Amino acid sequence: MVRRLSEIAGLLGLELRGEDREVSGVNTLEAAGPDEISFLANPRYMGQLSTTRAGAVIVAAEHAQDVAVALVSANPYFDFGRTLALFARKQGSFEGVSEQAVVHPEAVVGEGCAVYPHVYIGPRARIGAGTVLFPGCYIGEDCVVGGGCTLYPNVVLMAGVEIGDDCILHAGVVLGADGFGFARTEFGIQKIPQVGTVRIGSDVEIGANTTIDRSVLGVTTVGDGTKIDNLVMLGHNVEMGRNCLIVSQVGISGSTKVGDDVTMAGQVGVAGHLSIGSGVTIGPKSGVAKDIPAGETVGGAPAVDKSTYMRTLTVMPKLPDMYKRLGKLEKELAELKKSLSEEQ
């Protein structure tokens, strides 16, 4: 696909400074050629502006003079994404409902849906208009899938799960498996039935092989606009707010409540029955064992406030040397005590 820079600027509301020309794709500053657009969002790559061969660069206004052709943006990274969408190849071209799909007679599939071979749609399930179900998807009985959704291969929605409009579920996502509920008894470990469900809002994206368990009672929820990375685990009865960013390998234990606009970096672990306030940021590999008030930034295991965490990071590399010095001081102190004792 070939587009003129003036066309892209018009579509995205950007200012074109320099020669109007045709481009056919998007690439990094380092790899882009004369027929490609690039972008600068991270100051770390400022030096590449002078060496890039890109036909045009999406930049903030203060850097427009540093390139021959600029698309001036208030948010270069976001507008890079919008530009990329103009050139991105659509995944899949199947239309209609495959004869190799199994659709229960009581299920309802909306207009314009693409249901690939080897999809199963159970009794009373409802699929919204324009939704795409890739091969191997399992939609259990009484599930509701909104309009404009994309479910990539082998996504599983167990019975009664609901997802809103315009959601993207990547390969291997499982929503509505039983929560981890067991009781120790004199007869061994006994299962507690998990009879609730999972409800996902609209405009939610969930990464590959992420699992969100059904609740014991009630609903496990994820709010509108939240984005969840690959390999994340949400336990039963978790309530997650809107517009959260949850990075890979996060685990949130059962019945924890997470507010809106929360960010959890990679490998964060959150204990159960906690409250994480809106606007909280949790650093990577943190272990959260107590409630966090709204707006806080925390890190570490156990998680502490940012200033304490940063001081801890500063001290940690010095500990081996401090340990040696402490041992030496203890030895000198013992010798001094012995000397004083002998003098008495």
UniProtKB/Swiss-Prot annotation:
GO terms for molecular function: N-acyltransferase activity. The active site is at H236 (proton acceptor). It catalyses: a UDP-3-O-[(3R)-3-hydroxyacyl]-alpha-D-glucosamine + a (3R)-hydroxyacyl-[ACP] = a UDP-2-N,3-O-bis[(3R)-3-hydroxyacyl]-alpha-D-glucosamine + holo-[ACP] + H(+). InterPro entries: Hexapep, LpxD, Trimer_LpxA-like_sf, UDP_GlcNAc_AcTrfase_non-rep. The keyword Heme does not apply. GO terms for cellular component: membrane. Pathway: Bacterial outer membrane biogenesis; LPS lipid A biosynthesis. One of its GO terms (biological process) is lipid A biosynthetic process. Its EC number is 2.3.1.191. PANTHER family: UDP-3-O-ACYLGLUCOSAMINE N-ACYLTRANSFERASE (PTHR43378), UDP-3-O-ACYLGLUCOSAMINE N-ACYLTRANSFERASE 1, MITOCHONDRIAL-RELATED (PTHR43378:SF2). Belongs to the transferase hexapeptide repeat family. LpxD subfamily. Catalyzes the N-acylation of UDP-3-O-acylglucosamine using 3-hydroxyacyl-ACP as the acyl donor. Is involved in the biosynthesis of lipid A, a phosphorylated glycolipid that anchors the lipopolysaccharide to the outer membrane of the cell. Homotrimer. This is UDP-3-O-acylglucosamine N-acyltransferase. It comes from Nitratidesulfovibrio vulgaris (strain ATCC 29579 / DSM 644 / CCUG 34227 / NCIMB 8303 / VKM B-1760 / Hildenborough) (Desulfovibrio vulgaris).
